[in-house]
A protein has these predicted regions:
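Functional-site microenvironments in short loops/helix caps that host divalent-cation chemistry
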Residues: 1-134, 138, 143
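Short, structured beta-strand segments at or near domain termini in extracellular proteins/domains
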Residues: 144-154
């Protein structure tokens, strides 16, 4: 995506939204908050990965058992590249692509570095684990970093 933190934040603001805080991102990605779920996720339970107890079904470098619907292998020296949005396994809270595909910017108080969450197709399953911490310079951009906007409810 090649979007740095400030660019992602400006886009969200333009859409009358914002980047999630790191805490909001973690909560949405790992803790099931739907009282009735069409998946087998249990209300109130926190999972190890954004798709449950294992990383199976997401677009990561290895160990995730996902077959990408787009073949970038000839263009890349590593990994499979991005997958189309929403084609990976549906995760916690019915959200897609919270694990792997692209790191997502999340806001923290530090002025120079910001959080990136969820891992990406460039990395293995460890980077999308609940306990993984990643910080990047807010001016950094890379093909494997993206974002999602959120809207405050109040």
């Amino acid at each position: 995506m090649h979007i740095n933190f400030d660019e992602a934040q400006m886009f969200c603001k333009w859409k009358d939204k914002r980047l999630p805080s790191e805490e909001e991102w973690i909560y949405a990605a790992y803790t099931e908050m739907r009282k009735t779920s069409s998946s087998n996720f249990i209300y109130g339970q926190t999972y190890e990965y954004p798709v449950g107890d294992t990383p199976e079904g997401v677009n990561c470098l290895e160990d995730c058992k996902f077959k990408n619907n787009v073949n970038y292998k000839k263009l890349l020296s590593r990994g499979n590249g991005h997958s189309k949005v929403g084609v990976t396994k549906k995760g916690i809270n019915g959200l897609y692509d919270m694990g792997a595909n692209v790191w997502e910017w999340a806001n923290i108080e530090n002025k120079r570095t910001k959080a990136t969450k969820g891992g990406s197709w460039w990395y293995g399953k460890e980077q999308m684990h609940l306990k993984h911490q990643a910080r990047k310079d807010k001016k950094m951009s890379a093909v494997y970093i993206g974002f999602r906007c959120v809207k405050s409810l109040n």
